[in-house]
A protein has these predicted regions:
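Solvent-exposed loop/turn and edge beta-strand elements of beta-rich ligand-binding domains
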Residues: 1-266
Length: 266
C-alpha cells in the first residue's frame, strides 16, 4: 500500500514485440504503434465499476534490412554460401529467419510457435540463409543494434570466413520522437538518417586482415548493402604448417626419383 499518493505523477512504461508483418515495411515511412491505459474512475468500486481511458500514446517504429552480396575477389557472384545471424559475439543467441517471397524474414518466435534462446528448440519455420544464383542474401525485418553474421559453409572451392562479421545498424531519430501524436502523419520525418558499419576479419596466406567498413545505406528503403568476399581455398600453405611439410617431403621424394632415373640412364 502506497501512502500520500494524491496528486503525484504516475509514469507507466511498456515493451512490445513486433510481429512478422513488420518486415514488410522496412525504412520510411515507418508505422504507428499505439497503447492506452484503461483505469477505474469509480472511487466506490473495487475495480469492477466504471472505467476510463488515457489518450492514445503512439510511437513510430522502424525495421531495417541488410542486402548481402557474396562474391570472390574478382567480383564474381557466388552461389551456395550458408549464413546464420546472431545477436551476440559468441554466436550463441541466433536471430532466426524464415524464407519469404522477397528474402529471409526475421521470425517472431511466439507467432512461429517456437522457443527463445533458453535451451529450447528453434522456431518451426527457421532456416539457414543461402546465397542464390545472383549471390544475394536479403535479410529483412531487423531492429537497430549490433549483429554477427556467421558463414557456416563456403561455396565449393572457397575458404570459409574464420570469424563472424560484426554489423551495426545505427538510425538517427528526431529529438521529439516521444512526442508524436497518433494520426499526426509525416511519420517518415521521425527517421532522420541511417548508418551501418561492418567489421570484417579474414585470414589468408598466413596473414590476418581486419577492415572497418562504412556501408552504403538508403533510409527510404531502410537497407544497408554488404559485400562478403570469399577467396579460393587452394593456396600453398604458409611456411611451417604441416601441409607444407608434406608437400616439401613429397617434392624431395620426386626429385630423388628423378635423380635415380637419370643415373640409371647414364
Amino acid at each position: 500500500k502506497q501512502e500520500n499518493t494524491y496528486g503525484q505523477k504516475v509514469t507507466l512504461t511498456y515493451e512490445a514485440t513486433l510481429n512478422d508483418l513488420a518486415a514488410n515495411d522496412t525504412g520510411r515511412p515507418g508505422f504507428e504503434n499505439d497503447v492506452r491505459l484503461e483505469f477505474s474512475n469509480d472511487a466506490d468500486s473495487n475495480g469492477d465499476g466504471k472505467t476510463g481511458f488515457t489518450p492514445w500514446d503512439t510511437v513510430v517504429c522502424f525495421t531495417y534490412r541488410i542486402d548481402i552480396v557474396k562474391t570472390n575477389d574478382h567480383d564474381k557472384v557466388l552461389q551456395g554460401a550458408h549464413f546464420r545471424l546472431y545477436s551476440d559475439k559468441d554466436c550463441k543467441n541466433e536471430v532466426y529467419v524464415k524464407q519469404g517471397d522477397t528474402g529471409y524474414h526475421v521470425i517472431n518466435r511466439d507467432s512461429a510457435g517456437g522457443t527463445d534462446h533458453t535451451g529450447g528448440s528453434q522456431p518451426q519455420d527457421a532456416v539457414e540463409m543461402v546465397s542464390g544464383a545472383d549471390g544475394q542474401v536479403i535479410l529483412i525485418g531487423l531492429d537497430q543494434g549490433t549483429y554477427w553474421l556467421k558463414e557456416t559453409k563456403a561455396p565449393d572451392g572457397y575458404r570459409l570466413l574464420k570469424d563472424p562479421i560484426e554489423i551495426k545498424i545505427i538510425p538517427t531519430y528526431t529529438d521529439d520522437r516521444n512526442n508524436y501524436i497518433k494520426g499526426q502523419g509525416a511519420t517518415a520525418e521521425t527517421l532522420k538518417e541511417l548508418q551501418a558499419t561492418a567489421h570484417i576479419k579474414s585470414f589468408y596466406d598466413g596473414a590476418t586482415e581486419e577492415n572497418d567498413l562504412q556501408l552504403e545505406t538508403d533510409p527510404e528503403q531502410g537497407n544497408a548493402n554488404l559485400t562478403v568476399v570469399n577467396k579460393v581455398g587452394s593456396k600453398l600453405p604458409v611456411t611451417g604448417t604441416p601441409a607444407l611439410a608434406i608437400l616439401l617431403v613429397t617434392g624431395a621424394g620426386l626429385m630423388a626419383v628423378a635423380v635415380t632415373k637419370a643415373r640409371k640412364k647414364e
